[in-house]
C-alpha cells in the first residue's frame, strides 16, 4: 500500500515503511501500468480488441487508463510502468543515424534486389505516432516500444520494400523515388493501423 504525504498512526510491530521516489512520467510520454496484484481482472477492451486484455485502474493486468506527465505514487514492487512516447518519433533504417530514443539502434539500410537484377541499399526513415489512449492497447499487445519496432515495424517496412523492389528496375527507384515513397507510405499506414500505431510518413533516403 502506498502512503501519501501526511501524518500516519502505524503499528511498527506490524508494518514497515519504506520511502521511495515517486514514479515520474516525462513530458512527451505516457506511462502504461502493468499491475501484478489487485482486484481480479475483468477484460474491458471490448470485442474489437482481440490481441490483449485491458483492465480498470486498480485491477490486476494492463490498466486501460495511461499515466500522464507528472509524478505518480505507485508501488513499483508490484507494478511495472512502460513509457510510450506520444510525440512523433523517427525510426532510421540506416547505420548513419540513430534517434535519441534508441529504438532504432539495430536498424540498418535495407538490402534490395531490383527487377533487372541489381542489388542496392535503401535508407528509409519512418515517422510514427502513438496516441495516449492507444498506448495501453499497444503495450497489452506487444509488451514494449522496442517490440513495436522489432516485431512489427521492421518486418512490415522491410518486406514491403523487398517485394516492391522486385517489381521495379533500379532506374525506377532513382528517377521516380517520390512515387515509390508515396506507395510505401500508403501501404505502411494501412498496415500499422491494425496495431493501433499511426504511420505519419515514410521517407526514402540514400540509394547506394
Model regions and ranges:
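N-terminal hydrophobic membrane-entry segments
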Residues: 1-208
Amino acid at each position: 500500500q502506498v502512503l501519501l504525504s501526511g501524518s500516519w498512526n502505524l503499528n511498527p510491530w506490524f508494518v514497515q515503511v519504506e520511502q521511495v521516489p515517486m514514479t515520474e512520467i516525462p513530458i512527451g510520454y505516457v506511462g502504461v501500468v502493468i499491475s501484478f496484484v489487485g482486484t481480479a481482472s475483468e477484460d474491458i477492451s471490448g470485442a474489437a480488441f482481440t490481441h490483449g486484455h485491458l483492465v480498470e485502474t486498480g485491477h490486476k493486468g494492463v490498466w486501460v487508463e495511461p499515466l500522464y506527465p507528472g509524478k505518480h505514487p505507485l508501488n513499483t514492487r508490484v507494478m511495472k510502468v512502460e513509457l510510450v512516447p506520444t510525440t512523433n518519433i523517427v525510426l532510421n533504417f540506416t547505420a548513419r543515424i540513430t534517434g535519441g530514443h534508441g529504438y532504432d539502434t539495430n536498424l540498418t539500410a535495407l538490402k534490395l534486389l531490383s527487377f533487372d537484377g541489381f542489388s542496392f541499399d535503401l535508407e528509409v526513415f519512418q515517422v510514427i505516432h502513438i496516441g495516449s489512449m492507444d498506448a495501453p492497447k499497444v503495450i497489452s499487445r506487444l509488451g514494449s516500444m522496442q517490440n513495436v519496432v522489432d516485431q512489427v515495424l521492421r518486418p512490415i517496412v522491410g518486406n514491403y520494400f523487398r517485394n516492391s523492389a522486385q517489381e521495379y528496375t533500379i532506374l525506377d527507384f532513382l528517377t521516380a523515388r517520390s512515387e515509390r515513397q508515396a506507395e510505401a507510405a500508403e501501404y505502411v499506414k494501412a498496415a500499422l493501423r491494425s496495431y493501433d500505431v499511426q504511420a505519419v510518413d515514410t521517407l526514402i533516403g540514400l540509394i547506394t
